[in-house]
Amino acid sequence: MTIERAYTASDGVVLLHGIGCTSRSMRKLERSLQQAGLTTLNLTYASRKKPLALLTEDIHPAIAAFGEAIRGSLHFVGHSMGGLLARVYVARHRPPRLGRVVMLGTPNRGSEVADLLQSSRLYRNFYGPAGLQLTTAEDETLARLPPVDYAVGIVAGTRALDPIAWRFVLPRPNDGRVSVARSKLEGMADHIAIKATHTGLPYHRVAISQTIAFLSEGRFERTTLMPPLNRPPGYPASQPNSPTAHPPH
């Protein structure tokens, strides 16, 4: 983990990588957050070894200590499955000064790629129990989560490196692992789609700048290339501040 203690008077941000990755995948984003004046906790956790509920308990001591070391709000930024882990963590160990949550390519409603691969022994052996929680059949742990009553901003990607998953497995638009439609979450404060791949989201210049914008303002910055939030029917508005294919990370 990395804690930049020079910024302990500021807000803090917990960064959670996706399945099969490490904190290194979030390092570029972390540096940008630090340059914006935020304190960071960039965790590596055993994403392939345990289900989400147990992973939450693994990361809790470090996050609790980090929260006590800062004076401001405690925000979360999760890439892919890291966003799901953030949701489970907040439900079980809600910080007293909870800030905002940004999700990058998170399969909030599952992924058809995981549906396709879940019966594969190779998939099960490599991605472990958490990999089986990424399907479109709502996992029990995720189904029991309360509605979000905190500001969640979601960045989805619309480019893919895998043409098979992009064209034949996932509804379009998608990032090669998660469709834009399945990245959405009931009660989210804001949502944007950018021209980035799933794996590339934590490195993407626009995704990084939009993450910083949401953590600061509770909403994403709009340009002519970024249309207003379009929620599907039934999604209530919430206040901005209140193996050729791979599974989502």
Residue locations for each model-derived region?
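A broad structural signal for short, well-ordered beta-strand segments within beta-sheet-rich domains
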Residues: 9-10, 188
